[in-house]
From Swiss-Prot:
Residue ranges crossing the lipid bilayer per the database entry: none
Name of the featured protein: UPF0180 protein BCAH187_A1552
Species lineage: Bacteria, Bacillati, Bacillota, Bacilli, Bacillales
HAMAP family: UPF0180
InterPro entries documented for this protein: UPF0180
Species this chain originates from: Bacillus cereus (strain AH187)
NCBIfam families: PRK03094.1 (NF002845)
Similarity field: Belongs to the UPF0180 family.
Pfam families: UPF0180
Amino acid sequence: MAKIGVENSLTDVQQALQQQGHEVITINSEHDAQGCDCCVVTGQDSNMMGIADTSIKGSVINAHGLTTDEICQQVESRI
């Protein structure tokens, strides 16, 4: 399965993605996002960690306003 980076405050999303069989990495800094197929961020400060500018190979999903299920669906559609 995919390697998904998830911002540390999104524990419900981390658990849901792990249950789907994904490898979940907690993102605490820009460096943590490297090597991830996809990253999920809170969007509270849209580029606080510089993730939007990093050269990760996958998508960056803004979780703001989305349910856990909606986030998981977006992850599945982008990997």
